[in-house]
Regions:
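Conserved alpha/beta-hydrolase
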Residues: 139-156
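Short glycine-enriched nucleophile-adjacent loop
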Residues: 198-210
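The serine-hydrolase catalytic nucleophile loop
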Residues: 126-135
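Short beta-strand element of the alpha/beta-hydrolase
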Residues: 113-122
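Conserved acidic catalytic loop of the alpha/beta-hydrolase fold
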Residues: 168-188
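Glycine-rich "HGGG/HGxG" loop immediately N-terminal to the catalytic nucleophile
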Residues: 128-129, 151-164, 226
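Alpha/beta-hydrolase
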Residues: 238, 242-324
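A catalytic-pocket lid/entrance helix-loop region that shapes and gates access to the active site
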Residues: 207-260
Length: 324
């Protein structure tokens, strides 16, 4: 309702605002309803006759059960849309990876085609919907598998973000690769990574070159700290050039990376303005999809939608500083 109101009544076309608002409203609404239930139950017993209190309790419990059912149904009915083809595959499923439950999206028009494993950006990022949208053409010639890495959206609960290390990603990546090699009967698969995933992919290929036909990097990262220093300086120079004193003061106050704490918020302070700069200067043009539309996807239940943002924040904040 919130999204429809913004788009069709108020005529506001702002995917990022819609996502943040919709998730916030979901959390606030569910939290408020559950809090109201507790208050209602307590007051029912304190201020009402026994019969009225019993009826009120029954109504409250029923409402609570319906709310829980709504959340559960949203989780268990999440899916990836069907793919048409001679022998198609379109599955969204959990897999056991080194004793933990993580998620895979598998999509392709012919399951006999070579497997292409895609590693999302992050750490903590989820690109199930982005991959489905952007890699539709690849599904003709490959079985495109998107791995929800530990700490990201649907795989958020696989492990405490504070316990994730680079070795965790490498071990889990090797295990996912082995699952795919065994299931599809392929000695070697293709590997592709975006941003953080491009660095992870290089390291996975270095450890097990015998498992991969080729590696494809997009937004390739090779030096985490140098990347952040360059991004920080670019954002600071652009803020000075455009007279954005508030941003200049904020960036100068926090200083350049590396950071020992508050990494997610400090990194976002200069990365977020850079995205706007790229669009304003024409460096980014012709885009057909925004990553911020991702949480709308049918791949995510209500809890997943919350974890989409919380997982990125928590996991990035816990892991990224250790990659410097």
């Amino acid at each position: 309702y919130y999204v429809c109101l913004r788009r069709h009544v108020l005529r506001i076309q702002d995917p990022r605002g819609e996502v943040y608002g919709a998730v916030a409203l979901t959390v606030v609404t569910l939290g408020g309803l559950l809090s109201a239930l507790v208050i209602r139950v307590v007051t029912a017993f304190l201020h009402r006759p026994a019969a009225a209190a019993a009826i009120s309790l029954q109504i409250s419990l029923l409402t609570g059960a319906l709310l829980i059912l709504m959340v559960v149904l949203s989780q268990v009915t999440a899916f990836t849309p069907a793919v048409e083809g001679p022998d198609p595959i379109s599955e969204l499923r959990p897999v056991t990876v080194n004793g933990r439950t993580e998620w895979l999206s598998l999509r392709g028009r012919d399951r006999s085609k070579p497997v292409l494993l895609f590693l999302s950006g992050g750490p903590g990022g989820s690109q199930l919907v982005t991959a489905r949208h952007c890699f539709a053409d690849l599904e003709r010639d490959y079985v495109v598998v998107t791995w929800e890495q530990p700490g990201a959206a649907k795989s958020y609960s696989a492990i405490n973000p504070a316990d994730i290390t680079l070795e965790t990603y490498l071990a889990d990546g090797a295990a996912v690769t082995e699952i795919l090699r065994r299931e599809f009967g392929q000695d070697r698969i293709y590997l592709m990574g975006e941003s953080w995933g491009s660095a992870l992919g290089l390291m996975m290929a270095r450890e097990h070159p015998e498992h991969y036909r080729a590696f494809i990097g997009t937004g390739q990262m090779v030096d985490f700290l140098e990347t952040e220093r360059i991004d920080y300086q670019m954002a600071l120079e652009d803020a000075r050039r455009t007279g954005n004193k508030k941003l200049v003061d904020k960036l100068e106050e926090q200083g350049p990376p590396p950071y020992e704490s508050g990494i997610a918020l400090k990194t976002n302070a200069y990365l977020s303005p850079l995205y706007g700069t790229s669009a304003r200067t024409g460096q980014l043009r012709g885009a057909t999809f925004s990553t911020m539309e991702g949480p709308y996807g049918v791949e995510y239940g209500l809890l997943d939608k919350v974890a989409f943002f919380w997982g990125l924040y928590q996991t990035f904040d816990s892991v990224y500083g250790r990659l410097y």
